[in-house]
């Protein structure tokens, strides 16, 4: 099953503050939609020897080899078995590089008001915190906005 959100990209507001929210355990994180190319169901990942532990391997997307990162491993959270809601969010950067990130579930896309975004507290001692770009204060609670570049590139990442 494949969910391509490219059609939704044409309806974004001019301010570009669309955020895709996903969950790992009970915590909801966000990624700026401008980096999201597509969302696919978890599929067979080819393991590559001698790569960092958080990189699960590679997948083939329409003939392109795409590295896949476990967000759980990256954040130092215990891995769990994949289920029917486990997804790979395929990110694409300005240079054309693509990287997939494995998440427990995709939640929703929301247009976030810039006034609801604030800097993170300076608590970089927790592994996952260094990947948090900012906090988003929504009616449903505070959400954590991920810094995609740090998530992918920190300590010899995949991109």
Q: What do these predicted regions represent?
A:
Residues 1-159:
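An acidic, low-aromatic, low-complexity terminal/linker signal
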């Amino acid at each position: 099953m494949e969910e391509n959100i490219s059609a939704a990209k044409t309806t974004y507001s001019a301010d570009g503050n669309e955020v895709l929210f996903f969950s790992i355990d009970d915590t909801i994180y966000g990624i700026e939609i401008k980096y999201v190319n597509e969302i696919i169901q978890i599929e067979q990942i080819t393991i590559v020897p001698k790569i960092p532990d958080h990189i699960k391997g590679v997948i083939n997307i329409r003939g392109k080899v795409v590295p896949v990162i476990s967000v759980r491993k990256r954040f130092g959270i215990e891995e769990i078995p994949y289920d029917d809601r486990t997804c790979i969010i395929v990110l694409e950067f300005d240079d054309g590089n693509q990287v997939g990130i494995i998440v427990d579930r995709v939640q929703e896309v929301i247009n976030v008001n810039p006034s609801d975004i604030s800097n993170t507290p300076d608590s970089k001692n927790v592994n996952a915190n260094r990947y948090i770009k900012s906090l988003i204060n929504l009616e449903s609670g505070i959400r954590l906005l991920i810094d995609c570049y740090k998530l992918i590139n920190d300590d010899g990442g995949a991109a």
